[in-house]
């Protein structure tokens, strides 16, 4: 009678593993806007272009709708609407920073669509930006997309190919 119990005990860990669905691995980040992608080094901001905040890309937007490049939880949504942090279910952390020094606009020209704590899917709107107003105020509207926890991942590789849409992979991620 002890044999079936032992067999069950041996099967239980395997059965438990089968019941647990691991988080779908995040293998890519898409462009957060339609526009032209560029290497991070070409972004006119020394902190971002140095890679100090992680590997990523710059995107000069041609449209003002900025969307989530990955699915996850919005962990940061600045009141000014210019920056968003998203953490995926498997721990990839991305920062979407809209424009250079645009925090100085204090939200003018930015219409946020999400708030901290909200779940988003890839492609969900984060903010609508009046690109003309940003330019008229003298600011560079380049969007910076970086993986802020690059150091804890196996590889974070920017894939830059000029014109992009919100379904274009701009960063490949390997755990």
Protein language model regions, located:
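Contiguous, well-folded functional domains in the mature portion of proteins
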Residues: 6-175
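Pore-lining transmembrane helices
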Residues: 1-4
